[in-house]
From Swiss-Prot:
Organism: Emericella nidulans (strain FGSC A4 / ATCC 38163 / CBS 112.46 / NRRL 194 / M139) (Aspergillus nidulans)
EC number: 3.4.23.-
Highest taxon in the source lineage: Eukaryota
Subunit: Binds ubiquitin and polyubiquitinated proteins.
CDD domains registered for this protein in UniProt: RP_DDI (cd05479), Ubl_Ddi1_like (cd01796)
Signal peptide range in chain numbering: none
Taxonomic lineage from the root: Eukaryota, Fungi, Dikarya, Ascomycota, Pezizomycotina
Residue ranges, annotated region (Disordered): 58-89, 346-382
Originating gene: ddi1
Protein name: DNA damage-inducible protein 1
A single Gene Ontology CC term: cytoplasm
Length: 418
C-alpha cells in the first residue's frame, strides 16, 4: 500500500482531501506519496499523525496531530468512533470498498467473477457508488420480503400450509449444507472433466478416437468414413434411426476394417451415423471384444497388456473440446447451469446461502405436537476472517453468510458481499 492510497482511505473515513493531509510518522513528515508503507518502515498497528491544513487561510490544527491507525478509524472521541462504526455496519462506505478492490488483485478477481457489473465500474467512483447502492437496495428489499414471509409463518405455525413452507425451508437448508460440504471436501466435482481420447489410425488415416464405454457400438461420422476410404464398404441394410437424447440417421455398418491402436493392428466394425461431430467413437463392442481396460490411475487404455496413454487436455484438438464447451445447458431456479450431456456445473447457483428459518421454529422439537423446526447452522469460520470482513463495514451475520457461500475463503467472501 502506498502513501497515496493511505491518504485516499483516510479521505473516505474523514472527508479530508489528500491535498490537505500531512502524514507524520515518528515525528517525520511523509512527503513522498509514491513510497509504500514498507519502505518508510510502517508496520501493522503503528500509529500515524494527520495534520490537516485548511484552505483559504483558515487556522490549521495547531500542533495537534489527529491519531489514526493503519486501516483504522480516526476521530476525536471514543463515543464518536463507536457511532461511526455502527453507521458503517449499516451502510458500508462505497469508496472504501472500491479502494479495497483496486488494492488487492485477488479480491478484484473474485469480484470480477461473482459481480462483473461492479468490477467493470471500479475505476469510476461515482458510477461504482451508484451500482453498489442499487445492488444493496435490491438485496435489502429481498431480505425484507423474506423476513415478512417468515413473520407470517410465525404468526400461525400450526397451519398445514405454513408447515409445508417450513418443511421446504428445512429442505433448502439441508441442500445448502450438502453443497457446502461438497465444495469443501471434493470441489473437483464442480469442474469439467476432460474426455478420454486416444490417437488411432483407420486404414492408414490418423485421427483421435473418443473412448466411450457407455456407447453400445463403435460410431464413425460419414466425413471420417470418407476420409478413411471405407465409405464404399457401408452396408445400408443396417441403416435406421438412433434414438437417445435426440435422434440421428444411421447410414449403415462397415463390418470389418483395420484400426491401429498403439503398435497393435486390430479388426473393428463401425456404425456410420450422421449428427455426430466426433469423428470416431470407440464403443463397448470394440472395448469388450479386445478386452480393453480403461485405467484412469495410469491415464491409459490398456489392450493386451499394452498401455495407450490418453491425450492430455492440451493435446486434444480444439474442435473436439468445443463439442462439449458448446453443449446445451439446463438452468436451475437459482441460476445454476449444468451441462446437458456431461453434467458439469458451468455456473453455480446464485442463492447458495441458506434461507433463514422462522425464529419460532429455530429450535428442535421434542414432541410431535409442535411444528417442525428450522435448523440454522452455527458459524464455523475463524474469528479472524469474520473480523476482517466486519472491518470493511459489514455485519457479523453478513460475514458469516459470505464465508459459508465462499467455503471459508476470505477473498471470495469479500467478493461475494461486494
Amino acid at each position: 500500500m502506498t502513501i497515496e492510497l493511505l491518504k485516499s482511505i483516510v479521505e473516505s473515513e474523514t472527508s479530508i482531501p489528500p491535498s490537505s493531509q500531512r502524514l507524520v510518522y515518528n515525528q517525520q513528515l511523509l512527503g513522498d506519496d509514491s513510497k509504500t508503507l514498507e519502505q518508510v518502515g510502517i508496520g501493522e498497528g503503528d500509529m500515524l499523525g494527520v495534520h490537516v491544513t485548511l484552505r483559504g487561510g483558515a487556522p490549521s490544527v495547531q500542533g495537534q496531530a489527529r491519531p489514526t491507525g493503519i486501516g483504522g478509524t480516526s476521530g476525536a472521541s471514543h463515543s464518536q468512533q463507536i457511532q461511526q462504526r455502527r453507521q458503517q455496519q449499516i451502510n458500508p462506505d462505497p469508496e472504501m470498498i472500491r479502494l479495497h478492490i483496486l488494492g488487492d488483485p485477488r479480491v478484484r478477481d473474485a469480484v470480477r467473477q461473482r459481480n462483473p457489473e461492479l468490477a467493470d465500474v471500479a475505476h469510476d467512483p461515482h458510477r461504482f457508488r451508484e451500482v453498489l447502492l442499487t445492488q444493496q437496495r435490491l438485496e435489502s428489499q429481498r431480505e425484507a420480503e423474506k423476513e415478512a414471509r417468515i413473520a407470517m409463518l410465525n404468526a400461525d405455525p400450526f397451519n398445514p400450509e405454513n408447515q409445508k413452507e417450513i418443511e421446504e425451508i428445512i429442505r433448502q437448508n439441508a441442500v445448502t449444507e450438502n453443497l457446502h460440504n461438497a465444495m469443501e471436501h471434493h470441489p473437483e466435482s464442480f469442474g469439467r472433466v476432460t474426455m478420454l481420447y486416444i490417437p488411432v489410425e483407420v486404414n492408414g488415416h490418423k485421427l483421435n478416437a473418443f473412448v466411450d464405454s457407455g456407447a453400445q457400438v463403435t460410431i464413425m461420422s460419414p466425413d471420417c468414413a470418407t476420409a478413411c476410404n471405407i465409405m464404399r464398404l457401408v452396408d445400408s441394410r443396417y441403416g435406421g434411426i438412433a434414438k437417445g437424447v435426440g435422434t440421428a440417421n444411421i447410414l449403415g455398418r462397415v463390418h470389418s476394417a483395420q484400426i491401429k491402436i498403439g503398435d497393435m493392428f486390430l479388426p473393428c466394425s463401425f456404425t456410420v451415423m450422421e449428427g455426430k461431430h466426433i469423428d470416431l467413437l470407440l464403443g463397448l463392442d470394440m472395448l469388450r471384444r479386445h478386452q480393453a481396460c480403461i485405467d484412469l490411475r495410469r491415464g491409459a487404455l490398456v489392450i493386451q497388456d499394452q498401455a495407450v496413454p490418453f491425450l492430455g487436455e492440451a493435446d486434444i484438438p480444439k474442435h473436439l473440446l468445443e463439442e462439449f464447451e458448446d453443449e446445451p445447458v439446463i438452468k436451475g431456479a437459482d441460476g445454476a447451469e449444468v451441462g446437458a450431456r456431461t453434467g458439469a456445473v458451468t455456473h453455480q447457483a446464485g442463492g447458495s446461502t441458506p434461507a433463514p428459518g422462522p425464529s419460532s421454529a429455530a429450535n428442535a422439537t421434542a414432541s410431535s405436537s409442535r411444528p417442525a423446526a428450522v435448523h440454522r447452522p452455527s458459524p464455523r469460520w475463524p474469528e479472524a476472517s469474520i473480523a476482517k470482513i466486519t472491518e470493511l463495514g459489514f455485519t457479523r451475520e453478513e460475514a458469516t453468510r459470505a464465508l459459508e457461500a465462499a467455503n471459508g475463503d476470505l477473498d471470495g467472501a469479500i467478493g461475494f458481499l461486494i
